[in-house]
């Protein structure tokens, strides 16, 4: 197992990919705010003539992307962690390879139940639903406030069933 701190430059990212290709479980950190932006950051650090090759390479070695954000709790004591989870299933790997990173968010939404993926909005919604964070905090952190507001509105819809929390939260509750 190899842990690479901040992957900021081409040389470091190139080394991480090379190490992962040799079969070593490789962890790296980047300061990004979504799974898609993480993948774009890795690819974009390379010159344009190499990016197709890097997309193919990354699609083969990527094992997961976890983005996290610590948010102030509603009760004012401590922080709650919102997280985005990307699990590279065959569809995700294909989107990376075909340079369709912009479609990953939709694939993550669809892969919540089956693959354990989760968008930040799904995580924010679960934290808000459990009253761990305020609506203001949830909306401030959301990159798609309309989507999050729709999720929240469905929760309060008369006669409507409350949506189930994202898979990681549902499992932790058991």
Kindly give the residue locations of the regions a language model identified:
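Short, flexible helix-loop junctions that flank or precede catalytic/ligand sites
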Residues: 1-174
């Amino acid at each position: 197992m190899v842990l690479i701190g901040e992957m900021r430059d081409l040389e470091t990212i190139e080394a991480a990919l090379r190490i992962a290709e040799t079969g070593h479980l490789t962890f790296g950190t980047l300061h990004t705010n979504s799974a898609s932006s993480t993948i774009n950051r890795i690819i974009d650090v390379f010159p344009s003539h190499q990016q197709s090759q890097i997309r193919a390479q990354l699609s083969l070695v990527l094992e997961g992307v976890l983005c996290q954000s610590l948010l102030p709790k509603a009760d004012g004591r401590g922080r709650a962690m919102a997280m985005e989870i990307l699990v590279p299933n065959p569809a995700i790997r294909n989107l990376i390879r075909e340079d369709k990173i912009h479609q990953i968010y939709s694939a993550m939404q669809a892969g919540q139940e089956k693959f354990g993926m989760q968008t930040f909005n799904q995580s924010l919604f679960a934290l808000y639903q459990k009253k761990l964070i305020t609506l203001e905090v949830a909306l401030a952190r959301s990159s798609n406030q309309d989507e999050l507001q729709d999720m929240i509105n469905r929760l309060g819809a008369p006669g409507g069933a409350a949506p189930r929390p994202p898979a990681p939260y549902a499992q932790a509750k058991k």
